[in-house]
Amino acid sequence: MEPKLLLSAHKPLFVSCNSPFNEKTKLSVKSGLPMSTIRAARSQFMGEGLILGNKYGFWSTSRKTRVVVEPVRAAVKRRKELTFDSVVQRDKKLKLVLNIRKILVSQPDRMMSLRGLGKYRRDLGLKKRRRFIALLRKYPGVFEIVEEGAYSLRFKMTSEAERLYLDEMRIRNELEDVLVVKLRKLVMMSIDKRILLEKISHLKTDLGLPLEFRDTICQRYPQYFRVVPTPRGPALELTHWDPELAVSAAELSEDDNRTRESEERNLIIDRPPKFNRVKLPRGLNLSKSETRKISQFRDMQYISPYKDFSHLRSGTLEKEKHACGVIHELLSLTTEKRTLVDHLTHFREEFRFSQQLRGMLIRHPDLFYVSLKGERDSVFLREAYRNSELIDKDPLTLVKEKMRALVSVPRFPRRGGPRKDEEGREVEIDGSDADGEEEEEESDAEEWSDVDGYLEGEDGGNDDDGDWTDDEGEEDVPPNFDDDDEDEEEDSVKIGLSPSSRKSSSPRKKEEKVLTPVFPDGTPREKW
């Protein structure tokens, strides 16, 4: 068939015959494997697709149908709270001091040279070429520099810091039973009742474990747990399940709250309130839909972190409810009821956490707070804090607060601050305690009385009111703008004087500045 060309003025040029280029492409797949094509539903990506649906084919056993589960989404905006951020900020210096102390106590006599400390510059996170002697002198309450020879400088802990360190070691030995319970509860929450020691070491400081817990606590109690080798390293495995320990802190607090509320209200009929209010942080304004989602999530049935959760599917509300319960219980085991978000991500395999763990924590502002202060994000258990202070403080936390007080001791104390006696106790200088120092301070008080009166804004408390009325007429005289530089210097010196002294010197000054009127040629001018 020969092609015919049709020309038209209002239509473009086209071929009238059926060209093979205009036909739809047909794909044929030929293979030795038996397969059948089934008409599938229209997809949003590929349109109408083909599904290999032979029930008894080669791929039937290896290819399973996957059910798409949408992740739980609750777009809650994070609000910055200074009460929690200040907790992270005030521990910034303390963290550096504790790291230096950890290096120092590893020495035989707890004394180290500054040259030896320079080898740990990278471990301490010090990037700049900073002199260690200047760094240690910033904390005179913790470290003391000792000179041995002309070019040998060594440092050690002060007597107060040494005493605090010994108290901390004593408290850790007394709380060893509590630390064993924390390890048992941590392993009991895992899915396989086994956790790698390398992962537990990330939480050793937060849980209050000693540095050598692998060789001490993990080896002393084989009736509770044991260390087993694994292809990924040694792991702590549970050997005895205690049902009495399988009670979370949330369940205990719920029972206590219910008992206390029933006693306070003295209700005749025990019934839930008609309207359940969601307690949110101050300043966090959420929409009605977001508040409703948080309320519905809170009213869901509580899933204990110690129950078997292998049947829970990831991405469901039930799995997120269980994950929040695990994190709540894990934070309640820590000494300060907070930890780093990165530490929690190490336990994704043991607790089946989602990949968006930080987002899950932000979605529940009524339970947790995520602080972005510092190099790494921190998560707080909200109910354990009142403003920026812990409600129930661990003995190790009390020791840490004393250490923080030593870190904040300034190198040069301010004048007028509290003084310390020989035993290191603060002494307030009262009238009865400072009898011997009154004579030494009398001269200073006389010299600085005018300056203090000017700074405090006093109106001449010891002066009579009549002294101010004698010079009222002189204040109405306009100022003289023809002063010399020497007069300006005298005025600048007398700025710090009290009003009474400045008033007494003004008549003498004006007598010296009396000028006679003259003509331009210098002849005196008559007064009228």
UniProtKB/Swiss-Prot annotation:
Residues 429-491 have a biased composition (Acidic residues). One of its GO terms (cellular component) is chloroplast. It is found in: Plastid, Chloroplast. It holds the Pfam family PORR. The keyword Chloroplast applies. InterPro entries: PORR_domain, PORR_fam. Residues 410-528 are annotated as: Disordered. It comes from the Eukaryota. Residues 1-73 form a transit peptide. GO terms for molecular function: mRNA binding; RNA binding. Residues 80-408 form the PORR domain. Its main location: plastid. Residues 418-428 have a biased composition (Basic and acidic residues). GO terms for biological process: Group II intron splicing; mRNA processing; photosynthesis. Keywords: Chloroplast, mRNA processing, mRNA splicing, Plastid, RNA-binding, Transit peptide. RNA-binding protein involved in group II intron splicing. Binds specific group II introns and promotes their splicing. Functions in the context of a heterodimer with the ribonuclease III domain-containing protein RNC1. This is Protein WHAT'S THIS FACTOR 1 homolog, chloroplastic. The lineage of its organism: Eukaryota, Viridiplantae, Streptophyta, Embryophyta, Tracheophyta.
